[in-house]
């Protein structure tokens, strides 16, 4: 393959990776919740049996009903939440890519989901059905900056990752580059 064929292929195919659940914040929260919930659960169980399972807390002084029972309940709930977070990290839910292929005339939005019948989420549309790129910007306490792909006769498909919002400059640049590549208009700016 020559350099010119590589360059022409990159002019025809664009693939943007999308980060899934394997983000630093998910690892952090899954670990913190597991450690905290395990502590609650151990203190609750210690109050039931009347001896310390956690050496630096005097849990035999805690009455099982109601404090120990409530702590055990919160511990179990926290452990279950942590297991859920760890499973989404292991399965890498949400990871995938957005592919725009002028060569084959398709737009493919691919994501990994939860195990089961719909594990692979693969949306394929003809590239000529793309109407526009829409940008949604909401400021405030919970800012939202999302790029959407508008498809004829279908609902809008979000293309940006969830998590830390992009800066205004980054979102404008990404939307403009994508609209230029697909040769469609930008809405919402």
UniProtKB/Swiss-Prot annotation:
As for membrane topology, the entry says: Multi-pass membrane protein
Give the transmembrane ranges: 31-51, 70-90
The record's listing under InterPro entries reads: PSI_Ycf4_assembly
Q: What's the superkingdom here? A: Eukaryota
Q: Name one GO cellular component term.
A: photosystem I
Keywords attached to this Swiss-Prot or TrEMBL record, sorted alphabetically, are: Chloroplast, Membrane, Photosynthesis, Plastid, Thylakoid, Transmembrane, Transmembrane helix
- List the subcellular locations: Plastid, Chloroplast thylakoid membrane
A biological process (GO) of this protein is: photosynthesis
Briefly state the protein's biological role: Seems to be required for the assembly of the photosystem I complex.
* Protein family per UniProt: Belongs to the Ycf4 family.
Q: Give the protein's recorded name.
A: Photosystem I assembly protein Ycf4
Species of origin reads Chlorokybus atmophyticus
Lineage of the species this protein comes from = Eukaryota, Viridiplantae, Streptophyta, Chlorokybophyceae, Chlorokybales
